[in-house]
Amino acid sequence: MLTSIRHNYRLSAIITPTTAAQADTLNAGPSFGDFVAPDAPLSPAEAYEIKTVQVGPEGRKKTITRLPEWLKTPIPSNANYKKIKKDLRGLNLHTVCEEAKCPNISDCWGGSDKSAATATIMLGGDTCTRGCRFCSVKTSKAPPPLDPHEPENTAEALSRWGLGYVVLTIVDRDDLADGGARHAMETIMKIKQKAPSMLVEALVGDYAGDAEMVKLVANSGLDVFAHNVETTEALTPYVRDRRANFKQSLNVLRIAKETKPELITKTSIMLGLGETEDELWKALKDLRANDVDVVTFGQYMRPTKKHMAVHEYVTPDVFEMWRQRALDMGFLYCASGPLVRSSYKAGEAFIENVIKKRRMGRGGQVGGAQIAEMEKSA
């Protein structure tokens, strides 16, 4: 009898009726459908409509915004996705895809063949010394020491996957005298030793403005030097860590280009942070003045409630407008869309084509017809 009473007590403790406030909270949270694209395409009017829902107890309800339809993505699956994840765990490697909660992980990791799959390896560990208000990567003033095996393990993993184009993201390491530049250089050199034909893009920090460290990475053998300005100059103090500034980022990109002119230089800007049209125009002009080749635009998506709020969800039409404006200004390539991120597969395919054509001696600049042709293949 005592056993029965205890059993019933446990059940009653577990099966507790949901209160109205709890039900509201659950109903307003992400549903299964929030992460899965709908089967039937919506009309533009339906797709672009921002939906809201009221949550909270009576008398204290508040309105929150639902995720727009154009930001919904498939759940990660497929054999390539599982293989990449297994290899990463086995070699104790990290990816920005996971750490930054990228919405494109199912698309990039789940490519139908090896050449289509992409994973962005994060070097320097999984902890950054900067605390930008948009970023979900862990942060600390004193992160763990660098893993001396990371360069070799990274090169080994990438050689297993047989990819044609890889992306490395290096966390800021202000705790190190060289900012982690030599670690990045060693990794790139080992990748090129194991796979000479593999194209390497490295997304690096600003190395606190140290030009010698920028030159070190630029001369390491990489093909694409990426450094993100992230937002407009006016918003930089509110969005990025206080040690970062817009002009310093421009200098990093300029120094890399001057060090090795054949390098493709690349940067990314988030939209939806409250930037104005004039601020964006100025940012693009400044980037072109510093000979930046590639720019990408993507929607800022708030990782957690601790991060800065989304000011607006920018529609696909506006992203397309900025893509065309960037191309008209002379950028070699522009990927622009709500789900575009700095490491974006279609952009990588395009850049890969450009580098191969340059290696074959077909000229450094790409005309409008070539751009259209290569965008189709990407």
Swiss-Prot record:
Cofactor binding remark: Binds 2 [4Fe-4S] clusters per subunit. One cluster is coordinated with 3 cysteines and an exchangeable S-adenosyl-L-methionine.
Binding site for [4Fe-4S] cluster 2: 128, 132, 135
Binding site for [4Fe-4S] cluster 1: 97, 102, 108, 343
Compartments (UniProt record): Mitochondrion
Enzyme class: transferase
InterPro entries (alphabetical): Aldolase_TIM (IPR013785), Elp3/MiaA/NifB-like_rSAM (IPR006638), LIAS_N (IPR031691), Lipoyl_synth (IPR003698), rSAM (IPR007197)
Key words of the record: 4Fe-4S, Iron, Iron-sulfur, Metal-binding, Mitochondrion, S-adenosyl-L-methionine, Transferase
Radical SAM core domain residues: 111-332
MF (Gene Ontology): 4 iron, 4 sulfur cluster binding; lipoate synthase activity; metal ion binding
Reactions that this protein is recorded to catalyse: [[Fe-S] cluster scaffold protein carrying a second [4Fe-4S](2+) cluster] + N(6)-octanoyl-L-lysyl-[protein] + 2 oxidized [2Fe-2S]-[ferredoxin] + 2 S-adenosyl-L-methionine + 4 H(+) = [[Fe-S] cluster scaffold protein] + N(6)-[(R)-dihydrolipoyl]-L-lysyl-[protein] + 4 Fe(3+) + 2 hydrogen sulfide + 2 5'-deoxyadenosine + 2 L-methionine + 2 reduced [2Fe-2S]-[ferredoxin]
Gene Ontology CC annotations of this record: mitochondrion
Pathway: Protein modification; protein lipoylation via endogenous pathway; protein N(6)-(lipoyl)lysine from octanoyl-[acyl-carrier-protein]: step 2/2
The keyword Transferase is assigned to this record: yes
Transmembrane segments: none
Domain of life: Eukaryota
Cofactor needs: [4Fe-4S] cluster
Entry EC number(s): 2.8.1.8
Single biological process term from Gene Ontology: lipoate biosynthetic process
Additional comment: This protein may be expected to contain an N-terminal transit peptide but none has been predicted.
UniProt record similarity statement: Belongs to the radical SAM superfamily. Lipoyl synthase family.
Full protein name: Lipoyl synthase, mitochondrial
Organism encoding this protein: Phaeosphaeria nodorum (strain SN15 / ATCC MYA-4574 / FGSC 10173)
